[in-house]
Amino acid sequence: MPREIINLQVGQCGNQVGSEFWRKLCQEHGIAKDGRLEDFATLGGDRKDVFFYQADDEQYIPRAILLDLEPRVINGIQTSDLRNLFNPENIFISKEGGGAGNNWASGYTQGEAVQETLLDMIDREAEYCDSLEGFNMCHSIAGGTGSGMGSYMLELISDRYSKKLIQTYSVFPNQSESSDVVVQPYNSLLTLKRLTLHADAVVVLDNTALDKIAVERLHLHKPDVQQINSLIATVMAASTTTLRYPGYMNNDLVGLVASLIPTPRCHFLMTGYTPLTAENAAGQVTSNIRKTTVLDVMRRLLQPKNIMVSTHTKSRDIANAKYISILNIIQGEVDPSQVHKSLQRIRERKQANFIEWGPASIQVALSKKSPYVQTAHRVSGLMLANHTSVRHLFNKVLRDYEKLMGPKQERQAFMQAYRDVPRFADAAGGGTALLEEFADAKEVVQDLANEYAACESADYIQRQMMAS
């Protein structure tokens, strides 16, 4: 029986990426942009019910909730070719319409102010499910709505639906470009705290790496937002393919998460995808892939240039960094014996450096390709990996935060906009509650980075047992 997943898309980035995700799911299941089943979509074998439900007129409606504090992006969706796809009752735009002003505190408190409205939407959607498994949330960690309101949604759902899984697709800002959002490090730190404490799995999507992949692998001179969002949506769709086109293993979200996350706090996952082709980047000319054997795909997935997280590590750190776990989702008509041979070759050549305290093996899930989408390649692959080098991304957030705040909170640059939010202003006007919030978030994120560093040690398990 399908285990349903409710999808939340929060803020500008979340809704832009989310609309691309639903566009891909409709294509893969033979669903027209108005939710009607295409005449040619008669083959079956897929589980549409995981992400869609049917209305009385048999229209397929996404299990999606669209949230934003300013109207531009959602208004764009409502006037696009997807305008008849979503349930209008599941769309929330703030009545003020002024957005969060790139301010985490504003996004958080505006979400808190409409708690009952948000819960009504979530509860109603949950009632449409026969066996709700969990939630996916798509958002950015750097702006105001995706970070602040997204953080509030994580707290709200983990409290209300404590036994259901929460997985996020979290977009990290481009580290190689100067941002016009000067408080980006504040927003990122406060959001990372909630992702650490309230999410069960976080798929890290790093704009730095995505831009680099688009330029170097897809030969796009200046990739635009839509092209990057299409890449992200490709990863999202591929990561759910075993749920929608089930095989023998990894047919539910619980199984996927359990196979990748042996220790609860270390639940931040990297991704790699191959082959990167024209359909991944909205029809642009791309690099030619000459062959797509299982071995070729699995080798490519381990190449750093295909990983969608950029950690800017020193050579010494790279040598110490290790895989905690790897799950390769291989799509296409594949002979299982070829998978076994490919794994043997990779193991013999020691192409993946694993932790010493866990099973040093690559897990593989085989999935069918959609019969309704024509591709130029026979086999494609997505890697979901738990890798200790992700800690360098957290350390970068901490360093950027300290540049603004100061090591002992002595600088407090650009803090006034946060202090102006009533929740974080105390009676004395000093914003003590806000400073405590930042100090706590810093400690949580530092502990997270330290935990990933500790995973690189052979005696990690013994240390954990002694600590407990």
Curated annotation (Swiss-Prot):
PROSITE patterns referenced in this protein's UniProt entry, alphabetically: TUBULIN
Keywords: Cytoplasm, Cytoskeleton, GTP-binding, Microtubule, Nucleotide-binding
Entries under InterPro entries matching the protein: Gamma_tubulin, Tub_FtsZ_C, Tubulin, Tubulin/FtsZ-like_C, Tubulin/FtsZ_2-layer-sand-dom, Tubulin/FtsZ_GTPase_sf, Tubulin_C, Tubulin_CS
Highest taxon of source: Eukaryota
GO annotations of cellular component type: cytoplasm; gamma-tubulin complex; microtubule
SUPFAM superfamilies named in the record: Tubulin C-terminal domain-like (SSF55307), Tubulin nucleotide-binding domain-like (SSF52490)
Compartments reported by the entry: Cytoplasm, Cytoskeleton, Microtubule organizing center
CDD domains the UniProt entry points to: gamma_tubulin (cd02188)
Residues annotated for GTP binding in this entry: 142-148
GO molecular function: GTP binding
Entries under Gene3D superfamilies matching the protein: Helix hairpin bin, Tubulin/FtsZ, C-terminal domain, Tubulin/FtsZ, GTPase domain
One BP annotation, GO: cytoplasmic microtubule organization
Family to which this protein belongs: Belongs to the tubulin family.
Purpose: Tubulin is the major constituent of microtubules. The gamma chain is found at microtubule organizing centers (MTOC) such as the spindle poles, suggesting that it is involved in the minus-end nucleation of microtubule assembly.
Entry protein name: Tubulin gamma chain
Organism lineage string: Eukaryota, Viridiplantae, Chlorophyta, core chlorophytes, Chlorophyceae
